[in-house]
Swiss-Prot record:
Keyword Chloroplast part of the UniProt annotation: yes
Annotated protein name in UniProt: Cytochrome f
Function in brief: Component of the cytochrome b6-f complex, which mediates electron transfer between photosystem II (PSII) and photosystem I (PSI), cyclic electron flow around PSI, and state transitions.
Lineage, opening ranks: Eukaryota, Viridiplantae, Streptophyta, Embryophyta, Tracheophyta
GO molecular function, one term: electron transfer activity
Subunit structure: The 4 large subunits of the cytochrome b6-f complex are cytochrome b6, subunit IV (17 kDa polypeptide, petD), cytochrome f and the Rieske protein, while the 4 small subunits are PetG, PetL, PetM and PetN. The complex functions as a dimer.
UniProt similarity note: Belongs to the cytochrome f family.
Signal peptide region: 1-35
Binding site for heme: 36, 56, 59-60
A single GO cellular-component term on record: chloroplast thylakoid membrane
GO-annotated biological processes: photosynthesis
Organism: Platanus occidentalis
Membrane topology listed for this record: Single-pass membrane protein
C-alpha cells in the first residue's frame, strides 16, 4: 500500500514538472519570436548612430534595399502616410531557429523629426486603416514618440508597410518650426546573423576555429554537427559546434585552414536603410502663394482684355 502511494506521488510530481516545463517553453518561445525590435530598444538609447548607421545592421549583416515614400510637404496637425517598402523574392525560404525552412518576416524602424508622431486611431481615415491592416506600431521609447518600430510581421503580407503619421503644429509646440526635415528608415527581411550578446544565430556561416585535419564529424540527434579538428600545431582536439540549419561543406579526413567556412551561408535576407525629406509648410505661406498666383492670373486676363480693347480702337480708327 505504501509503495502504491509512493508511486502515485512520484507520478503526480513528474506530471506537474512536465506541465511547468511546457509552459515555460511556450512562454519563452513566444517572447523570443516577438522580441526582435526589442533587441535594439534594450541595447541602444537611439537606433541611429552618430555616423548615420542604424543599429539593426549590427545583427542583420547582409545589405538589402529599402524604400520610403512620403509627401513632399504637409500642413501642421495633418495625418499623412509614410510608406516603407521592403522588397524581396517571395519564393525564397529562410532557416528558422529550429533549423527548418520557413517564410521570411520583415520589420522596420522609422525615425521621424522631433514633434512628428504616430497618428491617433480617431484621426486615421478608413482608407488608411485598410492599408495599415492589422499592424501594431510602437514607440522606440516612451519619451521618443518620433521613432516608431514594427515587426517581425509576415513578409508576404507586409512587404509594404504604411505608417500613419501626425505632423506637429508650431502654434502649440514652440520647438517645432516650418522647415524641411529629414526622415530616416531601416527595414529588414529575414532573421539576423548575430544576437545582441554577440553570439551567432543559425542563420549564418560557421568557420573553423583551428587549422588541421577533421578527425570526426558527429551528426547530432536534434540536428546540427560536432566537428572534431586535430590541431595542426600540437594535435589536440578542437570541437566546433554547428547548430541545425547551415549545410555542411567539409568531410572527415579533410585538411582545413583557420577561419575556413565549414558550412554554407543560409541567409537569404538582409537589412537596408534610406532617407527622405519632408517640408512642414506654413499655411499662411501657402495662402500667400495662392494669392500671388491668383493676382498673376488676373493681371494676365486684364492684359489680354486691354490688348483686345486697344486692337478694337485701332481697327475703328483705320475704318474711319
Amino acid at each position: 500500500m505504501q509503495n502504491r502511494n509512493t508511486f502515485s506521488w512520484i507520478k503526480e510530481q513528474m506530471t506537474r514538472s512536465i506541465s511547468v516545463s511546457i509552459m515555460i517553453y511556450v512562454i519563452t518561445r513566444t517572447a523570443i519570436s516577438n522580441a526582435y525590435p526589442i533587441f535594439a530598444q534594450q541595447g541602444y538609447e537611439n537606433p541611429r548612430e552618430a555616423t548615420g548607421r542604424i543599429v539593426c545592421a549590427n545583427c542583420h549583416l547582409a545589405n538589402k534595399p529599402v524604400d520610403i515614400e512620403v509627401p513632399q510637404a504637409v500642413l501642421p496637425d495633418t495625418v499623412f502616410e509614410a510608406v516603407v517598402r521592403i522588397p524581396y523574392d517571395m519564393q525564397v525560404k529562410q532557416v528558422l531557429a529550429n533549423g527548418k525552412k520557413g517564410a521570411l518576416n520583415v520589420g522596420a524602424v522609422l525615425i521621424l523629426p522631433e514633434g512628428f508622431e504616430l497618428a491617433p486611431p480617431d484621426r486615421i481615415s478608413p482608407e488608411m486603416k485598410e492599408k495599415i491592416g492589422k499592424l501594431s506600431f510602437q514607440s522606440y521609447r516612451p519619451t521618443k514618440k518620433n521613432i516608431l518600430v514594427i515587426g517581425p510581421v509576415p513578409g508576404q503580407k507586409y512587404s509594404e508597410i504604411t505608417f500613419p503619421i501626425l505632423s506637429p503644429d508650431p502654434a502649440t509646440k514652440k520647438d517645432v518650426h516650418f522647415l524641411k526635415y529629414p526622415i530616416y528608415v531601416g527595414g529588414n527581411r529575414g532573421r539576423g546573423q548575430i544576437y545582441p550578446d554577440g553570439s551567432k544565430s543559425n542563420n549564418t556561416v560557421y568557420n573553423a576555429t583551428a587549422a588541421g585535419i577533421i578527425s570526426k564529424i558527429v551528426r547530432k540527434e536534434k540536428g546540427g554537427y560536432e566537428i572534431s579538428i586535430a590541431d595542426a600545431s600540437d594535435g589536440h582536439q578542437v570541437v566546433d559546434i554547428i547548430p541545425p540549419g547551415p549545410e555542411l561543406l567539409v568531410s572527415e579526413g579533410e585538411s582545413i585552414k583557420l577561419d575556413q567556412p565549414l558550412t554554407s551561408n543560409p541567409n537569404v535576407g538582409g537589412f537596408g536603410q534610406g532617407d527622405a525629406e519632408i517640408v512642414l509648410q506654413d499655411p499662411l505661406r501657402v495662402q500667400g502663394l495662392l494669392f500671388f498666383l491668383a493676382s498673376v492670373i488676373l493681371a494676365q486676363i486684364f492684359l489680354v482684355l486691354k490688348k483686345k480693347q486697344f486692337e478694337k480702337v485701332q481697327l475703328s480708327e483705320m475704318n474711319f
